[in-house]
UniProtKB/Swiss-Prot annotation:
Belongs to the 14-3-3 family. This is 14-3-3-like protein 2. InterPro entries: 14-3-3, 14-3-3_dom_sf, 14-3-3_domain. The lineage of its organism: Eukaryota, Viridiplantae, Streptophyta, Embryophyta, Tracheophyta. It holds the Pfam family 14-3-3.
Length: 66
């Protein structure tokens, strides 16, 4: 019975570590998405400052990124 309790505690500890790892990955993913959205929005705001050829190239790249 003591061995089972010890294995149970080890299993709980392992599951807690996995849960923390998953939570970290989710939070990192959300932060990366927000940073990407902000960079994209900033790039859109800068389009008006570009010449015609650069504007065409930039809009094509941004369409591909979207």
């Amino acid at each position: 019975l003591a061995e089972q309790a010890e294995r149970y505690e080890e299993m709980v500890e392992y599951m807690e570590k996995n849960l923390l790892s998953v939570a970290y990955k989710i939070i990192s993913s959300i932060e990366q998405k927000e940073e990407s959205r902000q960079a994209f929005d900033e790039a859109i705001a800068e389009l008006d400052t570009l010449g015609e050829e650069s504007y065409k190239d930039s809009t094509l790249i941004m369409q591909l990124l979207r």
